[in-house]
Amino acid sequence: MNDKIKALLNEQINKELYSAYLYVDIANYYDELDLDGYANYYMIQAQEERDHALLFMKYMQNNGYKVTLEAIAKPDKIY
C-alpha cells in the first residue's frame, strides 16, 4: 500500500472518531432537554461511527501498517 493510501486511511479514522464525538455531543444536548429518544438515537450513531474507526484501524494493523491517531476537533455547536 502506498503512503498516500495509508495517510488517507488514517485521516478517515480521525473523521470517524470526530463523527462519534459529535454524535455524543448532540446526544448530550438532547439529554439535557429530557428528549431521551433523540439522545439514545445519537448515542447509537456515535457507537456506529466508533465501530467504523475500529474497523479501519484493525485493517491497518492486520496488514502491518501504523495507525496514527490525531487530535479530535471540538464540535461547533450549531444545534
Model segments located where?
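Iron-associated oxidoreductase/ferritin-like identity signal
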Residues: 1-79
